[in-house]
């Protein structure tokens, strides 16, 4: 692309240094930095291409299945298969202009795909385009199918692939980067805080381990939901009875779809092992599969829970890095771009703020998905495109933002160790370890004395004749307080 052509770049400079900008662009350094630092989900209201590609994959295995069942010839099947592969490899993206604001069953998009495949397959057979189609969009490409069962099948297929192949690896990447920092800072003692007030000592590594555990639980929850997403509506046709669909069509298609997705994964991600194997099966009850999308809603709930964990992570990083001179200033976040158009030298926690907004959007997507999933009327849910678009949007947001946050924020996280130690030395909550020795009431009196006269705990304990200095030092050891059971 022109933007990455090294022969057509100009060098511009801001307070953080030099950066390349495409020669033909009017924007400057800070815009270029933002483009590099926030490559998170660009979208519109057109039907997501993931749905189009999934429909093409389904049409491919449907053509093969219909050939095996003797319903179409090998000539038609081969042409449809070739056309399908061109579509899901992105060769005809401009042929799919429809928006999600269409019929609630996704019929228009299903027919859009049928028409494109019909025209291209006919062209492959006849050698030229013609208004007379050898391959019919309904009779051949859509054989044994209805929009009512095929569109929800494409929904589940696309969301399963996005989740297993992109969302989970990105979340695992963030977890792994956090783990590196967790081990690096495990023995750095700081003051914990509850209710935003000083509490007892802990280590920075322990604090980071909390984020790791929350995110790991989120990953496990998402993974547990994927087998249910792999139960497909295909074979239900119009209302769930399977009218006009051959017996065994759904089972054969699911087996073939499992094999196709496995081949595609190994082609796209040659050296990696999938986080979860996608094994597709016909839905046990096709009536429920057409009228309800409970599995997708539950997955959306898992994403929503993940967003709450990420929100805490981003907010805490932002708070702990506040300052640098007039805030907590325990964390030192990487300076990715200048922070203010009016205050020179200011650097803001931009990755934290970006992730925070992503989390809010994911929560909003979940609310919309919840409402849309409730719109099953009699035998059909009629908000399918909206459910698909919101979940795929969430998948893209999670994939991009977690990787960005890991690489642009967590990876280069540093500590202001002097400030952290200063807080430990000043904390009156170290008194907690004294309560087994002098009791709660005297410990409270000690804190009140130290606070009133602006003195340290040790000095105050000696003045009040509660403990001698040697005994105080023997008891009050922040490292041992942080690891009372030696579980470093």
From Swiss-Prot:
General remark: There are 2 substrate-binding sites: the catalytic A site, and the non-catalytic B site that may play a role in the transfer of substrate or product between the active site and the solvent. Alternatively, the B site may bind allosteric effectors.
GO cellular component: cytosol; mitochondrion
Enzyme class: lyase
Predominant localisation class: cytoplasm
Stated pH dependence: Optimum pH is around 7-7.5 for fumarate and around pH 8 for L-malate.
Site (Important for catalytic activity): 353
Functional description taken from the UniProt entry: Catalyzes the reversible stereospecific interconversion of fumarate to L-malate. Fumarate metabolism in the cytosol plays a role during urea cycle and arginine metabolism; fumarate being a by-product of the urea cycle and amino-acid catabolism.
Keywords: Cytoplasm, Lyase
Organism phylogeny: Eukaryota, Metazoa, Spiralia, Lophotrochozoa, Platyhelminthes
Keyword Lyase on entry: yes
Any one GO molecular-function label of the UniProt entry: fumarate hydratase activity
Domain of life: Eukaryota
Protein name: Fumarate hydratase
Temperature dependence: Has a melting temperature (Tm) of 49.08 degrees Celsius with the highest thermal stability around pH 7.5. Thermal stability increases with increasing NaCl concentration. Both sodium acetate buffer and glycerol promote thermal stabilization.
Family note: Belongs to the class-II fumarase/aspartase family. Fumarase subfamily.
């Amino acid at each position: 692309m022109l933007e990455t052509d090294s022969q057509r770049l100009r060098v511009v400079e801001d307070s953080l240094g030099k950066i390349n900008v495409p020669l033909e662009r009017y924007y400057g350094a800070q815009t270029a930095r933002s483009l590099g630092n926030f490559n998170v989900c660009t979208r519109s209201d057109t039907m997501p291409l993931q749905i189009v590609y999934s429909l093409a994959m389904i049409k491919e295995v449907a053509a093969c299945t219909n050939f095996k069942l003797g319903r179409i010839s090998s000539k038609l099947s081969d042409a449809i298969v070739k056309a399908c592969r061109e579509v899901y490899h992105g060769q005809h993206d401009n042929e799919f202009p429809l928006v999600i604001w269409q019929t609630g069953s996704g019929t228009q998009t299903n027919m859009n795909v049928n028409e494109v495949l019909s025209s291209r397959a006919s062209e492959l057979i006849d050698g030229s385009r013609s208004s007379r189609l050898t391959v019919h969009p309904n009779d051949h490409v859509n054989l044994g199918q209805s929009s009512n069962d095929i569109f929800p099948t494409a929904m589940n297929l696309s969301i399963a692939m996005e989740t297993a192949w992109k969302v989970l690896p990105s979340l695992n990447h963030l977890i792994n980067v956090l783990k590196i920092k967790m081990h690096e800072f495990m023995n750095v003692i700081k003051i914990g805080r509850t209710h935003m007030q000083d509490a007892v000592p802990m280590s920075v590594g322990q604090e980071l381990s909390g984020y790791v555990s929350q995110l790991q639980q989120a990953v496990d929850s998402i993974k547990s939901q994927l087998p249910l997403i792999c139960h497909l509506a295909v074979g239900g046709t119009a209302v769930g009875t399977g009218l006009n669909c051959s017996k065994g069509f759904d089972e054969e298609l699911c087996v073939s779809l499992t094999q196709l997705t496995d081949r595609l994964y190994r082609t796209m991600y040659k050296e990696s092992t999938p986080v979860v194997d996608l094994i597709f099966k016909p839905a046990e009850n096709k009536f429920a599969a057409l009228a309800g999308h409970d599995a997708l809603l539950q997955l959306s709930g898992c994403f929503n829970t993940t967003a709450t964990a990420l929100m805490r992570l981003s907010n805490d990083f932002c708070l702990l890095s506040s300052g640098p001179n007039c805030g907590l200033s325990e964390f030192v976040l990487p300076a990715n771009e200048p922070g203010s158009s009016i205050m020179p030298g200011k650097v803001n926690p931009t990755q934290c703020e970006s992730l925070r907004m992503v989390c809010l959007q994911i929560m909003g997507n979940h609310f919309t998905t919840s409402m849309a999933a409730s719109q099953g009327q009699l035998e059909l849910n009629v908000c399918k495109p909206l459910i698909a678009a919101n979940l795929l949007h969430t998948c893209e947001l999670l994939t991009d933002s977690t990787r960005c946050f890991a690489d642009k924020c967590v990876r280069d996280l540093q500590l202001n160790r002097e400030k952290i130690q200063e807080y430990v030395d000043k904390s009156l909550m170290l008194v907690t370890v004294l309560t087994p020795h002098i009791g709660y009431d005297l410990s409270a009196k000690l804190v009140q004395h130290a606070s009133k006269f602006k003195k340290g705990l040790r000095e105050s304990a000696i003045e009040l004749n509660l403990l001698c200095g040697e005994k105080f030092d023997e008891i009050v050891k922040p490292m041992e307080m942080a690891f009372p059971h030696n579980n470093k």
